[in-house]
């Protein structure tokens, strides 16, 4: 989100990549409809489906609600933060409340494309922004900042 600046993913060339046609529910809103939106940049048709099912909102057919309705955007962000592990072993929420470290939040949210040396510049950018936020809040960032 660029530090919570952008509501939608900025790289439009990526938009068509977030449709997994192997899922039984497909991509009814169109192949390019499931790009990153909201505070955690919810992406992929299967995440829109799961978030929508959990929240009682048809996000599979109406993914634009995440960018057009701030309440929906924050609900999806909190849903992902609290329930999804991504390629990691814990949710981002569990990582923070159990003091496992900020690096586990990166792994839970973007581990497939950033962790394990896949995009060290992006990981560093996230860590730097996190350190700036913790400084503004007058707290320490803790350990295990990287994934």
Positions of predicted regions on the chain:
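Surface-exposed patches in mature extracellular/periplasmic domains of secreted proteins
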Residues: 5-7, 88-101, 141-145
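Alpha-helix capping and helix-loop boundary segments enriched in small/acidic/polar residues
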Residues: 68, 96-97, 118-121
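Extracellular low-complexity, O-glycosylation-prone Ser/Thr/Pro/Gly-rich "stalks"
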Residues: 84-86, 103-147
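Peptidoglycan-targeting cell-wall enzymes and recognition modules
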Residues: 1-80, 101, 105-108
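Flexible secondary-structure boundary motifs
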Residues: 78-89
């Amino acid at each position: 989100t660029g530090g919570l600046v952008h509501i939608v993913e900025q790289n439009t060339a990526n938009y068509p990549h977030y449709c997994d046609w192997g899922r039984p529910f497909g991509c009814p809103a169109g192949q390019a409809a499931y790009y990153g939106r909201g505070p955690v940049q919810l992406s992929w048709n299967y995440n829109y489906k799961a978030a929508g099912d959990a929240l009682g909102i048809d996000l599979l057919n109406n993914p634009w609600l995440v960018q057009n309705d701030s309440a929906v955007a924050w609900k999806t962000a909190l849903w992902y933060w609290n329930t999804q592990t991504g390629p990691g072993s814990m949710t981002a929420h569990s990582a923070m409340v159990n003091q496992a470290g900020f690096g586990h939040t990166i792994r839970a949210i973007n581990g497939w494309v950033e962790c394990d040396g896949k995009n060290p510049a992006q990981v560093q950018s996230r860590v730097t922004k996190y350190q700036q936020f913790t400084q503004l809040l007058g707290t320490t960032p803790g350990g295990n900042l990287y994934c």
